[in-house]
C-alpha cells in the first residue's frame, strides 16, 4: 500500500524539515470512526495529517486530480475523488462507509485551500457526515 510506504519512508524527513508542533495528540487516538476537521492552508496539509495521525486517514480530493497516473497514485494514498461543484452524493456515501467501518476520515470543512490564510465560509459536508454517522469531529 502506497500510503504505508510513503508514511514510513518519508516520515523522518518530514519531521526534520517541517518540525510540526502538535497539541492534544491524544485527541487523535480516538477509537472507531472519527472525522479529522482541518483548516487547509497548504498543499502539504493532508501529508502532515497523515504523518501525525496514529491511524490511517482517508481523504477526498477534487476529481480533477484523478486523471491519468493521478488516479492510481491518489487511490494508493487512500484518497477518493469528489466533485466540488455539485452535491456529490456518491462521495458523501463513500465517506460514510469509511466512518461506519471504524476508520478515520480527514476533511477540510471549507472545501478548498485558503488563499488568504483566513477561515473561509464552511461547506455543509463536515456537519452532515458528523450528524449522519455519529462520529466525533476532532479539530486539527
Which role fits each region the language model picked out?
Residues 1-6:
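Helix-enriched interaction subdomains in cytosolic or periplasmic regions
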Residues 7, 16-140:
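Soluble catalytic domains of membrane acyltransferases
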Amino acid at each position: 500500500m502506497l500510503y504505508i510506504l510513503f508514511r514510513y519512508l518519508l516520515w523522518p524527513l518530514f519531521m526534520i524539515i517541517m518540525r510540526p508542533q502538535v497539541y492534544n495528540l491524544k485527541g487523535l487516538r480516538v477509537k472507531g470512526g472519527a472525522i479529522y476537521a482541518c483548516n487547509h492552508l497548504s498543499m502539504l496539509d493532508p501529508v502532515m495529517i497523515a504523518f501525525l495521525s496514529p491511524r490511517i486517514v482517508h481523504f477526498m480530493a477534487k476529481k480533477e486530480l484523478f486523471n491519468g497516473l493521478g488516479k492510481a497514485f491518489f487511490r494508493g494514498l487512500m484518497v477518493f475523488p469528489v466533485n466540488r461543484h455539485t452535491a456529490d452524493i456518491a462521495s458523501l456515501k463513500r465517506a460514510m462507509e469509511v466512518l461506519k467501518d471504524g476508520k478515520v476520515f480527514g476533511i477540510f470543512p471549507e472545501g478548498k485551500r485558503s488563499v488568504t490564510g483566513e477561515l473561509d465560509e464552511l461547506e455543509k459536508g463536515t456537519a452532515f457526515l458528523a450528524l449522519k454517522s455519529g462520529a466525533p469531529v476532532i479539530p486539527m
